[in-house]
Amino acid sequence: MLGICRGRRKFLAASLTLLCIPAITWIYLFAGSFEDGKPVSLSPLESQAHSPRYTASSQRERESLEVRVREVEEENRALRRQLSLAQGQSPAHHRGNHSKTYSMEEGTGDSENLRAGIVAGNSSECGQQPAVEKCETIHVAIVCAGYNASRDVVTLVKSVLFHRRNPLHFHLIADSIAEQILATLFQTWMVPAVRVDFYNADELKSEVSWIPNKHYSGIYGLMKLVLTKTLPANLERVIVLDTDITFATDIAELWAVFHKFKGQQVLGLVENQSDWYLGNLWKNHRPWPALGRGYNTGVILLLLDKLRKMKWEQMWRLTAERELMGMLSTSLADQDIFNAVIKQNPFLVYQLPCFWNVQLSDHTRSEQCYRDVSDLKVIHWNSPKKLRVKNKHVEFFRNLYLTFLEYDGNLLRRELFGCPSETDVNNENLQKQLSELDEDDLCYEFRRERFTVHRTHLYFLHYEFEPSADNTDVTLVAQLSMDRLQMLEAICKHWEGPISLALYLSDAEAQQFLRYAQGSEVLMSRQNVGYHIVYKEGQFYPVNLLRNVAMKHISTPYMFLSDIDFLPMYGLYEYLRKSVIQLDLANTKKAMIVPAFETLRYRLSFPKSKAELLSMLDMGTLFTFRYHVWTKGHAPTNFAKWRTATTPYQVEWEADFEPYVVVRRDCPEYDRRFVGFGWNKVAHIMELDAQEYEFTVLPNAYMIHMPHAPSFDITKFRSNKQYRICLKTLKEEFQQDMSRRYGFAALKYLTAENNS
């Protein structure tokens, strides 16, 4: 803006100079032509004829003055040439390279404004206020449905948040899946000055389901047509974006374009950058009617209030009905109908400069739109191939996209200073809890972790599960970090039932996981595995938070609380379903124990039966889990009895007991105060006992722990004395809380701890 104003000041100075120099010159000459109140002729011949006081000296002075006048006139002509040159360059300076490329094609938009600006001298804009006020809220509408689109929305939102300087209000037209995912994401993201409202896309299906559509976006690709009806009646304007958009500038610049709309202009669109609507892409290609190349609807500026007054709903419906009589279906979803309406009513559209929607489709000509990185504003991956689209600059665009794809979303939780924000009750409570902590406490970081809100993306990959008729399904629940990713395929081979996994990853690691999963035939063949990403924050591994996330998002009545390092026996899923019925788990408070074993061998011939397992146990190939370092953890399972047991048997709780159990989904959550290594499962089993769960060992079930390198947290536990001191303090506080919650019955836990 500063550069534009400087250019205009130079323009103004040149104009003033052009006007002033001749005036000053002629005033000087006019004044100098009087001597003693009488006019003096500038012509030497006339002076000689009429002035008796003519001298050789005055003759030289007048000749000198005439030379000076000719020099001034020459300077005047030079200034005129510079001024005309400045006029010719003014629009290019104002718009960058874009006006050169698309000046003829943007006749209804910026090029007209530029021509008007040249006539007006462009000087008035220097002192104007910015088109978007500092704290003005920018409204953005996005249609989103399904698991994959939810991932795309996150990348789009990151790119918008990265550049934004204004409060944002997202209006998300989402199906039930996307709403669950994105509502949790935004709630845990806790970005200041961002509001999100959801609108049920399933309720809007009837509005557009009558339109046959061949586009890969399906019925949801038509829902932008009904935004005037869907969005709040008091919302006057909105920016509508596709999910495959990436911003490279502040969205406020696009919002400011609304101020350029004139007359009946209600739609801001960029011209389509392919020949699709010209109908020459292949033989017998018959596109929907469009004005010239047509317009792309990946980025739309909608003046909702005016559209409602124009009866937009009736306008697009009549147009669609008429065209469908001949076209039979849409090929590009809502875009075909928008273009058909514009063809009949060209006055509705304000043509945006092409850099607001640089389209990377298979037949794009978008390279004509940009000549420099600074020209790019919005990138649109509008090809079914997405990042694999063919384009000579695709590597540059892909890197820009990957920047936001892998960008740490936690860094976007920055305040907009000077802008009042709506009170967030959850955030206020969080700040209050944190303020009550003593920062000088040596265990402050442990205590703080309990209140940390981790950004969470549920169902990172497609999830689908059909429950059984007998309602006995069991979900395997586990948590992991990037270093345990290799266990996923093995677990999927051993467990055919549904799985709920919480993965503790950074944004970049989440993309590595996505590539790993999409490249795995085993994982891609399974639709009943729910992957929930909990993004990294803080210095500790929030093991119990991860377990709670995985537990909370299961779709079965029962769950098997396992760990990622264990492989369940083949057929365990079906065996547990039968045991659920046998032990009447639906109507009793029981925790079914699956005995745990371990091997020290990375390559193991996995036992296919209990008999094989006992044989390997006797040969020393297998051991009871942690028998040599933490015997108390699983001793109450009574492995000696299990060897010969043929029916389930009950065991009593003992200090430090931490078996792996199958319980109903309504069991208590894990205590979040325990992070990293130590006491995280022990505390949970203690609470189950306090709630009077019966611990029943299954005689024909088993699981085997596979060897792996020590985790970072167990290394800290073993090497850091303060870590162990804080863990002991947290244990004592947990036991005190148990006493307060469960009264006299909880005293046995204090006694057991003292005796252990």
UniProtKB/Swiss-Prot annotation:
Residues 53-95 form a coiled coil. Pathway: Protein modification; protein glycosylation. The chain crosses the membrane at residues 11-31. In the C-terminal section; belongs to the glycosyltransferase 49 family. In the N-terminal section; belongs to the glycosyltransferase 8 family. It comes from Mus musculus (Mouse). GO terms for molecular function: glucuronosyltransferase activity; glycosyltransferase activity; hexosyltransferase activity; manganese ion binding; xylosyltransferase activity. The lineage of its organism: Eukaryota, Metazoa, Chordata, Craniata, Vertebrata. Binds 2 Mn(2+) ions per subunit. The xylosyltransferase part binds one Mn(2+) and the beta-1,3-glucuronyltransferase part binds one Mn(2+). One of its GO terms (cellular component) is plasma membrane. Residues 43-64, 82-108 are annotated as: Disordered. InterPro entries: Glyco_trans_8 (IPR002495), Nucleotide-diphossugar_trans (IPR029044), Xyl/GlcA_transferase (IPR051292). It is a single-pass type II membrane protein. Ubiquitous. Highest expression in heart, diaphragm and brain, where it is especially found in cerebral cortex, hippocampus, and trigeminal ganglion. Keywords: Coiled coil, Glycoprotein, Glycosyltransferase, Golgi apparatus, Manganese, Membrane, Metal-binding, Multifunctional enzyme, Signal-anchor, Transferase, Transmembrane, Transmembrane helix. Residues 32-756 are lumenal. PANTHER family: GLYCOSYLTRANSFERASE-RELATED, XYLOSYL- AND GLUCURONYLTRANSFERASE LARGE1. This is Xylosyl- and glucuronyltransferase LARGE1.
